[in-house]
Amino acid sequence: MARIAGVNIPTNKRVIIALTYIHGIGRTTAVKIADKLGIDHARRVQDLTDEEVLRLRETIDEDLMVEGDLRRETAMNIKRLMDLKSYRGLRHRNGLPVRGQRTHTNARTRKGKAKPIAGKKK
């Protein structure tokens, strides 16, 4: 198993798919990385040479923010909004949808399981 950015990527999968196991790299970014390094999209991770894996690792470390750094950056951005007490920060703090979705009905994913209201029986 190749280890890139602190993640064991599966060796039996194609390079493009295997790179998406790293938090912060999706299909589009994986294709761009492979094209930049001249790696064929159909090749599997187990077929890569040690030099190619090393180049992959260096490219990802230099050019992209992935895994822990990305998670930390996202958390800090949300914390900054909460500290500013902006509208978005208050929505994050209250556990409500941040991007203008309705909450009268729906929004169960963000609000959690429905709470029963006492005295509301027929």
Swiss-Prot record:
Keywords from the named record: Ribonucleoprotein, Ribosomal protein, RNA-binding, rRNA-binding, tRNA-binding
Entry-linked InterPro entries: Rbsml_uS13_C, Ribosomal_uS13, Ribosomal_uS13-like_H2TH, Ribosomal_uS13_bac-type, Ribosomal_uS13_CS
Entry GO terms, CC: cytosol; small ribosomal subunit
Region of interest called Disordered, as start-end residue ranges on this chain: 92-122
Pfam families: Ribosomal_S13 (PF00416)
Keyword Glycosyltransferase: no
Cited Gene3D superfamilies: 1.10.8.50, 30s ribosomal protein s13, domain 2
Molecular-function GO terms, alphabetical: rRNA binding; structural constituent of ribosome; tRNA binding
GO biological process, one term: translation
Positions with biased composition (Basic residues): 101-122
Keyword Transcription regulation assigned: no
Similarity comment text for this entry: Belongs to the universal ribosomal protein uS13 family.
Assembly with partners or alone: Part of the 30S ribosomal subunit. Forms a loose heterodimer with protein S19. Forms two bridges to the 50S subunit in the 70S ribosome.
Its job: Located at the top of the head of the 30S subunit, it contacts several helices of the 16S rRNA. In the 70S ribosome it contacts the 23S rRNA (bridge B1a) and protein L5 of the 50S subunit (bridge B1b), connecting the 2 subunits; these bridges are implicated in subunit movement. Contacts the tRNAs in the A and P-sites.
HAMAP family: Ribosomal_uS13
Record's protein name: Small ribosomal subunit protein uS13
Organism: Erythrobacter litoralis (strain HTCC2594)
Lineage of origin: Bacteria, Pseudomonadati, Pseudomonadota, Alphaproteobacteria, Sphingomonadales
